[in-house]
Amino acid sequence: MKILVIQGPNLNILGHREPHIYGNFTLDQIHNNLQAQAKQNNAELEFFQSNFEGEIIDKLQECIGGEYAGVLINPAAFSHTSIAIADAIASCGVPVIEVHISNIHAREEYRSKSYTGAVSAGVITGFGAFGYHLALMGILQIANEIAALKAQQNNQNA
């Protein structure tokens, strides 16, 4: 099972960016922890980070009819502004879980609305870097349930 992990703008500078909000973890450390967790669950991860909205949309569109069983995404500030990324999530054809390091509901008012979260299967927010662990557990559970249902349908049709 292959899961796509998409990281949005400014996440490439985690560890340096406002550590009082986002902690001291770097993106590489988060990815290494996710990779270890995925290995324990017989899953493969592909990581993608971009500061550009269109590149994130292009990557989500690769999920259509593709090899991914699900997406874990931290759209960062784009979650509050990008209807285009929300549309790409809604039409990518696989379950998506949104994750935020900080609690977006406890910050500035404009951060409390998530266009992308509204079209995701779930949203994990405010657990720091551990939120990625929770999000991966969630997307693996959903993807496994979908795979089991598809197998059951195939057995009934055989």
UniProtKB/Swiss-Prot annotation:
InterPro entries: DHquinase_II (IPR001874), DHquinase_II_CS (IPR018509), DHquinase_II_sf (IPR036441). Substrate binds at N74, H80, D87, I101, S102, R111. The active site is at Y22, H100. Pfam families: DHquinase_II. CDD domains: DHQase_II. Gene3D superfamilies: Dehydroquinase, class II (3.40.50.9100). It is an enzyme of class 4 (lyase). Keywords: Amino-acid biosynthesis, Aromatic amino acid biosynthesis, Lyase. Pathway: Metabolic intermediate biosynthesis; chorismate biosynthesis; chorismate from D-erythrose 4-phosphate and phosphoenolpyruvate: step 3/7. Its EC number is 4.2.1.10. One of its GO terms (biological process) is aromatic amino acid family biosynthetic process. Coiled coil: none annotated. The record marks R17 as: Transition state stabilizer. One of its GO terms (molecular function) is 3-dehydroquinate dehydratase activity. PANTHER family: CATABOLIC 3-DEHYDROQUINASE (PTHR21272:SF3). NCBIfam families: aroQ (TIGR01088), PRK05395.1-2 (NF003805), PRK05395.1-3 (NF003806), PRK05395.1-4 (NF003807). Catalyzes a trans-dehydration via an enolate intermediate. Homododecamer. This is 3-dehydroquinate dehydratase. It comes from Helicobacter hepaticus (strain ATCC 51449 / 3B1).
